[in-house]
Amino acid sequence: MYLILAIVFGLIFKCFLESIIFYITFQFIRRYAGGFHAKTETRCEILSTLSILCCIVLIKLSKMYDIRIALLSISLVFAVLIFILCPLDTPEKPLNDKEYKYFRKISWIILSLIIVAIIVSFIFKFNVVFAPCCASLILEGVLIGTGKIKKVYNEKRASSQA
């Protein structure tokens, strides 16, 4: 469903290929790194749609304005955050030690591949790959950071009630 949304937004904003690249790279890193999860399915659908829309708009803006240095800088900051926090499990799907190590390793590999794609596409000014990969790291960075804040808050709240 969300791939279709990304494609539709890509067609509307005239960045079809970029929207597909964004969605694929985001799904790869998200699947293994984890991050924020909404409480309800409806909230998840709304937030996911808005997140995809914001990223496609960001990609479109990168085609209109030279924001490559800003995208590169923000992406690298979020890459460090993802590297530190991944994988982020949830109370609904906690990870045991073996799973944690596996997901961390895979997350780092995927993150490294996306960073290489960003750097190479930045050097060669290949914006079709650069902007979508940056958008995927920015979104995942926001989600993993938000997820970590939510997790710490819930743990503190639970321990204060005990």
What are these regions (language model features)?
Residues K39-L50, I69-I74, K98-R104:
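Cytoplasmic-side transmembrane-helix entry/capping segments in multi-pass membrane proteins
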Residues C55-I67, I110-F126:
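Hydrophobic alpha-helical transmembrane segments in multi-pass integral membrane proteins
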Residues F130-G145:
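Small-residue-rich transmembrane alpha-helices that serve as helix-helix interface/gating elements
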Residues F9-Y23, A70-V77:
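Structural signature of hydrophobic alpha-helical transmembrane segments
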